[in-house]
Structure formats: C-alpha cells, structure tokens
C-alpha cells in the first residue's frame, strides 16, 4: 500500500518530469519555427510545400527534427565515390572521401564540405547536443559528436533519409 511519503515523492517526480518534457518540447518548437518561418535560409517553403517534395520519412527528419531508426538506411553501407547531398534542396554536403564506418547504424563522416552545414544547440531528450542542419534549406541532418577519427576527431552522425547519394561520374 502506498504511504503518504511515497505518494509525495512520486508526485514530485512526475511533476518534474512533465516540466522538463514541456520545456524541451517548447525549445524544439522554437527551433522548428525558425526553420519554417522567419527563415534565414536561402530556400524556404511552407510545410505544405515541403510535404509535396519530400517523402513522409524525409519530412519527419528534415522538417520535424526526427531521427530514423539505426541501421535502416542503405547509405550507411554505401562506400562508392561521390557526394552526399541534402535530400531537401540537393546542396552537396559531404564527400565520400570523409565517410567512415562508425558502427552506429547511421552514415557518418568526419568532415562536411566547405560552407555546406551549420550547427545549433539541441537540448531535447534531457541532454545537450550539437544539431547539424543544411545551411541552405535548414533541413535537420543529424548531430555532430567529438568521438570521430583523425584528422578532425569529429563524427557527423547523419540520418540517411536526409541525404541523397550522387555517384561520381565515370572518367
């Protein structure tokens, strides 16, 4: 049977969890509003316009800051020569020369192409991470971590559904 002390602690824990959850959701909504309205990005579209050009999975990741399930993208195991472009606006983002197998189940790179991506602070999921987005359309790509290989020590952990692989033309 639940005594008064246990009930009090359970109530406090529930209230604290709800408070943190709504704070994170509010921060995420503000970030989403920045990428879909009053946008500093070269390419801006309404959510309806994005839905017409993206698959539901691409819309979820690129426009709603979602994450695809690990191991579901064929791009995780793609190592052919070429570039990985933004699935939203086709801006070249990463070269296959910087791709490596991180063992995470997501395509990973140690360095983006020059002037391709931008970063913001992501405080969702009870932690602080560095979110990576396309600098041209603002599409959410993934996150960058400081546990990658030389020469940068960085791991750009990208959602494969947010990328489009363009094979290098045969010479």
Give residue spans per PLM region.
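Mid-length scaffold segments of soluble, non-membrane domains
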Residues: 79-108
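Cys/His-coordinated zinc-binding microdomains
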Residues: 90, 138, 158-161
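Residues immediately within or flanking Cys/His clusters that coordinate Zn2+
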Residues: 83, 131, 154
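N-terminal secretory signal peptides and thylakoid transit peptides that target proteins
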Residues: 1-15
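N-terminal post-signal-peptidase region of extra-cytosolic proteins
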Residues: 62-79
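Short cysteine-rich clusters marking metal-coordination/redox-active sites
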Residues: 86, 134-137
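C-terminal segment of N-terminal export signals and the immediately downstream linker at the start
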Residues: 22-58, 69
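Short, non-ligating residues that shape and space the ligands of small metal-coordination modules
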Residues: 95-96, 143-144, 166
